[in-house]
Regions:
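A short, Lys/Arg-rich alpha-helix, primarily the initiator
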Residues: 1-16
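Residues within the alpha-helical elements of helix-turn-helix
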Residues: 13, 24, 52
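Short alpha-helical "recognition helix" segments of helix-turn-helix
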Residues: 20-22
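Recognition helix of helix-turn-helix/homeodomain-like DNA-binding domains
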Residues: 26-41
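Short, basic-rich loop-to-helix N-cap that marks the start of a DNA-contacting helix
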Residues: 38-51
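Short C-terminal boundary/hinge segments that cap the last helix of small helical domains
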Residues: 54-69
């Protein structure tokens, strides 16, 4: 799954569109599209995207023994 696909699935589930997500982030729709094309977001931006979608952002590592960090 690409970054664009992940964000677009979140947009669809939140029942908004790209322009509304951009507005909630304080970005222009053009900037959101550019960032979706590059697929490069900081952790803080991922947190903001999740908040704008009404979701929780989680990131971490799960090791073969089940340890999660």
């Amino acid at each position: 799954m690409t970054v664009r696909q992940l964000v677009e699935m979140g947009i669809a589930y939140a029942q908004i569109n790209n322009a509304e997500l951009a507005r909630r982030l304080g970005w222009s729709p053009q900037l959101l599209n550019k960032r979706l094309n590059t697929g490069k977001f900081t952790i803080e931006e991922w947190e903001n995207i999740a908040m704008a979608l009404g979701a929780e952002f989680r990131i971490g590592f799960t090791f073969p023994d089940g340890k999660q960090i």
